[in-house]
Amino acid sequence: RDVVAAVTNAGGYGVLGALAYEPERLEVELDWIDDHVDGKPYGVDFAMPAKYEGQGGGDKATPEYLASLIPEEHRAFADSLMEEAGIPEMPEDFDAAPKAAGLNVDLEGPGQVEVTLAHDNVNMVINALGPPPKYVVDECHQRDVLVGGLVGSRQHAERQLAIGTDVIIAQGTEAGGHCGDISTMVLVPQVVDAVGPDVPVLAAGGIQDGRQMAAAMALGAQGVWTGSMWLLAQEADMHPEVTENLLDATSTDFIRSRAMTGKPARQYRSAWVDAWEREDAPDTLPMPIQGLLFGEYSRRWSRVHSKEFGGHPAGQIVGSIDKVRPARDMVLDMVQGWIDVAEQFG
């Protein structure tokens, strides 16, 4: 939330990733942002997948039921990784609500949207992993709130338009988190051509300075969507070992893997990611079951601040960043860089 406020106050458009928040917690976060942006608009980003285990809700969508689907083979494999690394088990009295992309979408999604739309400063709701549910689009439009959608192909963009999405975010494979396999340079013009001149397109993936923003706009985008760069903003709430890994990384250290969520997502190549690439590793599980497994074990290594296992979804652009800086400076430098390129071309 601190990054959202800092970016917004610097003249950018901050967006809060709401995946991990139950409605009650989301209310707290949005209230805080409202109190720190002086009436400026910002957005909220969800990850409501088009396909996931437990879709439709009911008894077979509960975290307890989905966790019961984790095979013993997978737990044994994860246990062996922890034992080899000397990472202890969690205390017996430890209790935490399970979190994973694609979990509790049907149960908590309506409440998350209701909370979000009750905040007047929120003027866009964005969804990843497919078009948002129809009720999200309808409720947003009833309140004059824009709907944005991340896409990784021309076909994805067409499906977003069919459901009424207002802003298309063309996210290339360089991006952090869930992404496709088409590069930003190729994808953006394809999406711009597919949606036509009346639908704004934002470019995402491999963008963190003014040169890349200028290139994206030359491809037909009307702006850029940035994510991974903010992991290294001064205001970001990151574990120190993860920040250290990101600063030391090169662009080749960020690979697409299903090890974290069950769907292809670009992330730092931690020991957990490497392990699931091994020949003796079991197949990854579908979303959100793989995410539940990851969440269970990530609590263990986070508790002891394991640098070896300290990973995070992040894009290839992080390999170009070598220091932590205030978010305001990052915004202003990007704008100045764009101006410099524009002046070069007259």
Task: Name these PLM-found stretches.
Residues 60-77, 181, 186-202, 208-346:
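Conserved active-site-proximal phosphate/metal-binding subdomains
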